[in-house]
């Protein structure tokens, strides 16, 4: 997740909080020189849930998101 608009941080955090049961870990990196934040999030969720979450996040102003999927399939 790349955050270019600081005003979108609060709605982003709300979305992440609402989906916290899927979040394994989160790392935020402030890049002061470029005035952006880079956020990496590891999720354990069905692919459709991840896609929906990425869509919600990507619709926020000044935020872009990319997803990567593992080939590991859960038996849970």
Set out the residue ranges of the language-model regions.
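Long, contiguous binding/interaction regions
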Residues: 1-76
């Amino acid at each position: 997740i790349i955050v270019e608009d600081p005003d979108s941080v609060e709605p982003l955090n709300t979305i992440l909080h609402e989906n916290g049961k899927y979040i394994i870990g989160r790392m935020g990196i402030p890049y002061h020189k470029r005035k952006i934040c880079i956020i990496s999030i590891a999720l354990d969720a069905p692919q459709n849930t991840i896609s929906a979450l990425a869509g919600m996040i990507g619709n926020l102003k000044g935020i872009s998101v990319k997803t990567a999927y593992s080939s590991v399939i859960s038996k849970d």
